[in-house]
């Protein structure tokens, strides 16, 4: 009944939690990843993996206390997150086609592994698989294999 329904979507919900997540953005030169600890407040209504990707989409300029002169965004601004799903420790991320337009001055590896390494910082995620508008793409930026499952790559972290 309506009387027994509990609405916990209120912004003052006591179910809100805060987590510090290490996110990865591009170095100024664009060839390395820079680890940035980011505090994220969330509740049960939106999955943490979605919030983390949304922050990557916004870029580092929206994070308090972070100087964007040292780091840069890795995802094109007009990219849309269509869907994110977690199943059996694999995070499935579906972006719009704009994701394939690698930002100038950033290597393909840095663009992809900023998302992969950030998601794998979250509990229960060990692998990431990408799709574009619901379909598998074989290559990212016509150069890097993109159809496989990705695991963490710490070699790119400076």
What positions do the PLM features span?
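Bimodal "functional hotspot" detector
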Residues: 1-158
């Amino acid at each position: 009944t309506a009387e027994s329904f509990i609405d916990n979507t209120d912004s003052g919900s006591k179910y809100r939690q805060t987590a510090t997540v290490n996110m990865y953005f591009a170095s100024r030169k664009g060839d390395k990843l820079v680890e940035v600890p980011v505090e994220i407040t969330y509740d049960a209504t939106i999955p943490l993996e979605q919030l983390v990707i949304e922050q990557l989409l916004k870029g580092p300029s929206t994070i308090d206390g972070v100087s964007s002169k040292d780091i840069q965004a890795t995802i094109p601004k007009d990219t849309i997150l269509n869907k994110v799903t977690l199943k059996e420790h694999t995070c499935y991320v579906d972006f719009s086609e704009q994701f394939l337009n690698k930002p100038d001055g950033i290597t393909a590896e840095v663009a992809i592994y900023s998302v992969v390494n950030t998601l794998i910082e979250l509990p229960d995620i060990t692998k990431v698989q990408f799709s574009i508008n619901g379909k598998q793409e074989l290559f990212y930026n016509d150069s890097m294999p993109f159809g496989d499952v990705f695991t963490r790559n710490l070699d790119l972290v400076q």
